[in-house]
Structure formats: structure tokens, C-alpha cells
Regions:
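Short, solvent-exposed loop/turn segments at secondary-structure junctions
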Residues: 226-228, 240, 256-257, 277-279
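Fe(II)/2-oxoglutarate oxygenase catalytic core
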Residues: 1-217, 242, 261-270, 276-293
């Protein structure tokens, strides 16, 4: 399939986009791409590269079995939408008694792989959390309880890593350098990813991703079941969107404003975003043997 290339100007100012963080956008009037395409801004910086049907039905089914990671919870600040009362509210942790700043909105989103902290909303996952010699990262809860499913999908993760390298080699090279600074036990084997965010029928509001490698790139694939329409990945500032469906791959600059259009129908759309948690370079640095220095 031939790949088209487009250069797109900004339709909205940066100030306009910042004011609309956490708001939902419609796909009405926006150009939706449904076939292979590379899209750049006017400075030549890649916004996204989209490829159809890169995963086999069997690979999609393997990923789909991880959909349980996307539990209903309060974990995505701007992406879940910002209500009039604001992103956060205060609660008292039942386990620590501390005052916590938590989200006001819920979404079906979770994580697979590894995370850059031992705690999650006030709950400690390691009794040695205060030990300065212990790594400050952990296997995610879902990965730990579904280890065989995770291992079964490693070849798919590694294939996605390979496509990342082929599509955006410059960003891949920078992310590879960054992951070389992280303890290998917290890296998804034979990839330059530490973490996968799993979203289930999640219409995200306008946001930029945070916590990932700033010089890298986001890698999104979709595994779905049943029929649905919409759910486009929108880039409102540039007035275009991508219809990423079952087996498709979208390499994207996740630090560009983006969101999703409304999803209609009774089908299930699971999106998987592969990335590197930048904080791990400090919390879980690569262990260097003094004999190697």
C-alpha cells in the first residue's frame, strides 16, 4: 500500500490549545486519514506515521487478552476530561492516613510492564520502599497477576519495537540511548519500552502525554472486537485525525495536543501505547559493575 505524505499548518494557536486542555473535541470538520500516511508540521517535525494492518489477527487476539488491565479508575488527569470543579480533590488514604490529591474523573485505563514508583495513590507495594539500596520501580499489579499472558505477548511487543525502529529511526535511537540508563529488570525484554498503557473504549479529552521519554515517540496499536464507529485519534491543533483500528500501528508525537472522538456502537476498542518511563533513569538506574569502569 502506498504511503502519502502531508505537511500541515497549525489551525489553532498554542494559547487556544492550552485553554482547552481537558475538553472534548468532535471529529466534525476534521480530515480523517484511514490509510497509510506520514504527517509533518511546517518545520519538518513528524507528528505521526500511520500504517494499516501491521499485526496479524492472532497477534491482535493476544493483545486483546490483556484488556483486563484497563480497569475503571482515576488515573488519567487531563485525558479523562476536566470537570468544572477541577482535576483533583483531596481524600485521606485508608492505608497511610495521609492527605492525598486524587483525580475527580474516572476512565478505563491501566498499565502493563513496569512502573517508576513503589507506591500507587498512597498504597505501598514494597515493605522496603524506604531502603535507599532497593530499586524504586516495580512490576505493575496486572502484569504480576497475569504473568503468562504478558509473556505470551512479548513477541508482539518486540514486533512493535521493530516497527518503531523502521518508521522513526531518529526518535528510536534517542530512546534506545535513554533506556540504556535503566536497570534491565524493568525493561520489557528485547524492546526499548518499559511500560504499556492499555485503554478500553476510552474517549480521551485534549491532553499531552507526560512521564514518557521526551525525545522518543509514542507507539499506539489497536485490538478490537465487534462493531463500532469513531474513536479517531484527533490532532485538533492541526485539524486532522487517524482512524486507527484492529491491527493498525500509529507512531505519534505524544507531546502534541491530541484526544479521541466519540466512540459509538457495542464493539470494544482496546488501544495500547508503548513507551519509556523517563523517571526510571533516576529511580532505577542501570547497575554498573565497578570492574567494568
Amino acid at each position: 500500500m502506498q504511503t502519502e505524505t502531508f505537511v500541515v499548518p497549525k489551525f489553532y494557536t498554542d494559547e487556544f490549545m492550552e485553554k482547552h486542555e481537558g475538553k472534548f473535541f468532535s471529529s466534525k470538520g476534521i480530515k480523517i486519514f484511514k490509510d497509510n500516511v506520514d504527517i509533518f508540521d511546517e518545520q519538518g517535525k513528524p507528528i505521526c506515521k500511520f500504517r494499516k494492518n501491521v499485526l496479524t489477527p492472532e497477534e491482535c487476539q493476544c493483545l486483546f487478552q490483556l484488556n483486563g488491565a484497563a480497569k475503571l479508575g482515576k488515573t488519567r488527569p487531563s485525558a479523562s476530561g476536566i470537570p468544572p470543579e477541577g482535576k483533583y480533590k483531596y481524600i485521606i488514604s485508608k492505608s497511610t492516613g495521609k492527605k492525598l490529591h486524587v483525580l475527580t474523573t474516572q476512565s478505563r485505563s491501566g498499565i502493563v510492564g513496569f512502573w517508576d514508583t513503589l507506591s500507587n495513590f498512597g498504597h505501598k507495594h514494597d515493605k522496603h520502599a524506604k531502603d535507599s539500596k532497593k530499586p524504586k520501580c516495580r512490576t505493575t499489579a496486572y502484569t504480576g497477576t497475569h504473568l503468562e499472558q504478558y509473556k505470551d505477548c512479548l513477541p508482539v511487543f518486540q514486533k512493535i519495537n521493530k516497527i518503531f525502529k523502521e518508521l522513526v529511526p531518529k526518535q528510536y535511537s534517542k530512546q534506545k540511548k535513554a533506556i540504556g540508563l535503566i536497570d534491565s529488570q524493568f525493561i520489557i525484554p528485547k524492546t526499548i519500552f518499559t511500560t504499556v498503557t492499555v485503554n478500553k473504549n476510552f474517549r480521551t479529552a485534549l491532553h499531552k502525554d507526560s512521564g514518557d521519554c521526551k525525545e522518543g515517540f509514542g507507539n499506539l496499536v489497536v485490538a478490537s472486537c465487534g462493531n463500532y464507529t469513531g474513536g479517531y485519534t484527533l490532532f485538533p491543533q492541526y485539524q486532522f485525525g487517524i482512524d486507527c483500528r484492529n491491527g493498525d500501528f500509529l507512531a505519534m508525537d505524544v507531546h502534541t495536543w491530541h484526544c479521541n472522538s466519540e466512540l459509538n456502537g457495542d464493539g470494544t476498542r482496546i488501544s495500547f501505547v508503548f513507551y519509556l518511563r523517563e523517571k526510571m533513569q533516576k529511580t532505577c538506574p542501570k547497575q554498573v559493575n565497578v570492574l567494568d569502569q
